[in-house]
Amino acid sequence: MELLKLNRSVQGTGPGPGASLCRPGAPLLNSSSVGNLSCEPPRIRGAGTRELELAIRITLYAVIFLMSVGGNMLIIVVLGLSRRLRTVTNAFLLSLAVSDLLLAVACMPFTLLPNLMGTFIFGTVICKAVSYLMGVSVSVSTLSLVAIALERYSAICRPLQARVWQTRSHAARVIVATWLLSGLLMVPYPVYTVVQPVGPRVLQCVHRWPSARVRQTWSVLLLLLLFFIPGVVMAVAYGLISRELYLGLRFDGDSDSDSQSRVRNQGGLPGAVHQNGRCRPETGAVGEDSDGCYVQLPRSRPALELTALTAPGPGSGSRPTQAKLLAKKRVVRMLLVIVVLFFLCWLPVYSANTWRAFDGPGAHRALSGAPISFIHLLSYASACVNPLVYCFMHRRFRQACLETCARCCPRPPRARPRALPDEDPPTPSIASLSRLSYTTISTLGPG
């Protein structure tokens, strides 16, 4: 993907991930992870207005940069240190965090500093390297989102087939292929990136394409490969996941109602119900971090349920179902947020790039100045919203984050308070109740 270049005075250049530098005093514009930083002489406005816009943009740059670097570094550290989080999905999240961190580190400083200094001082090698890394980081981020969508679709909607190939070694191969494919796709950027003078002691890092047709073809190719096709795949995958989860909601409600009716009419014990081979969530996967529903095979001698130790009261069998319903609703909401944020962050940039490739003057008149700058800032924001959506809404990640912080900053042990005389005695643990259940079944003998 590439960003809009609005400087019409440089012939033969086009949008791309490099940072094309501004003339001194021009308003702050920026490039996204794959676009040029472009500047245009400021419109006739008051000095106070220009200074206010510049201050707002610099502040937004700083906030997004700190959130992107801090959030993605935290993800990398927590996922790397926590053994419990070394799963297939988290392997893709780790790759996504690395690509987002690369996007923030390799793009934003080389966008902001040349705007403030008025010229590109880093040389041709840095210009080509930054251009290439910007493109690779955005490509890896997009492909990682697609891989996560397909992995979750397989885990939830095709659980039996997914268990065969969903291993960490397979995820590692997919991640390596994602980085290699992105690296090959972005080879044209360093090839056609140059540093050229645009005025006395003013340099720009720009892309000089062979022709306008090549620039248009490249813009359409990136629009299809890195936005339209991934967006469709993600929308379809998460749509099918949402459909499966909502069907599971209705199935759980119907099956629990039937189970409670049998308990009331027959005096029996509620058991695990499976109708028509439809998948239901794994036992114990009631939390918000459950990421799949798997078919449970019936046991020959099911153990006595813990609820059988007490008489079934009104609503006692509905609590697990309510917990599962709430967990599934949270998953559906998170999936919708993922798709909406993806389109929200990248649709304006891709639309502007395509518009610029086919109608440069019209795009220049409409988007030069503050509009294109904030469009690019919106694309930068994707690097800091991904950690929030994928990890900070994950209960186990929050727990692992707290454990990591406690490990790095240990606190002195506190004295345990003594129990007061009027406190309730400790309740028996689940393990002791389980032993009681097993002993009861053993004494009763096989049914």
UniProtKB/Swiss-Prot annotation:
Cysteines joined through disulfide linkages: 127-205
Positions on the Extracellular side per record topology: 1-57, 110-131, 190-219, 356-373
Summary of the tissues where the protein is detected: Isoform 1 is expressed in brain, pancreas, stomach, the colon cancer cell line LoVo and the T-lymphoblastoma Jurkat, but not in heart, placenta, liver, lung, skeletal muscle, kidney or the stomach cancer cell line AGS. Expressed at high levels in the small cell lung cancer cell line NCI-H510, at lower levels in NCI-H345, NCI-H69 and GLC-28 cell lines, not expressed in GLC-19 cell line. Within the stomach, expressed at high levels in the mucosa of the gastric fundus and at low levels in the antrum and duodenum.
InterPro entries with a match to the protein in the record: Cholcskin_rcpt, Gastrin_rcpt, GPCR_Rhodpsn, GPCR_Rhodpsn_7TM
Cellular localization per UniProt: Cell membrane
Topological category with respect to the lipid bilayer: Multi-pass membrane protein
Lipid tethering residues (S-palmitoyl cysteine): 408
Region (Disordered): 258-285
Glycosylation: residue positions: 7, 30, 36
GO cellular component: intracellular membrane-bounded organelle; plasma membrane
Gene Ontology MF: a single term: neuropeptide receptor activity
Major localisation: membrane
Pfam families assigned to the protein according to its UniProt record, in alphabetical order: 7tm_1 (PF00001)
Cytoplasmic side: 80-87, 151-170, 243-333, 395-447
Any one GO BP annotation for this protein: digestive tract development
Assigned keywords, A-Z: Cell membrane, Disulfide bond, G-protein coupled receptor, Glycoprotein, Lipoprotein, Membrane, Palmitate, Receptor, Transducer, Transmembrane, Transmembrane helix
Residue spans crossing the bilayer: 58-79, 88-109, 132-150, 171-189, 220-242, 334-355, 374-394
Its biological purpose: Receptor for gastrin and cholecystokinin. The CCK-B receptors occur throughout the central nervous system where they modulate anxiety, analgesia, arousal, and neuroleptic activity. This receptor mediates its action by association with G proteins that activate a phosphatidylinositol-calcium second messenger system.
Protein family membership: Belongs to the G-protein coupled receptor 1 family.
Protein name: Gastrin/cholecystokinin type B receptor
Taxonomic placement: Eukaryota, Metazoa, Chordata, Craniata, Vertebrata
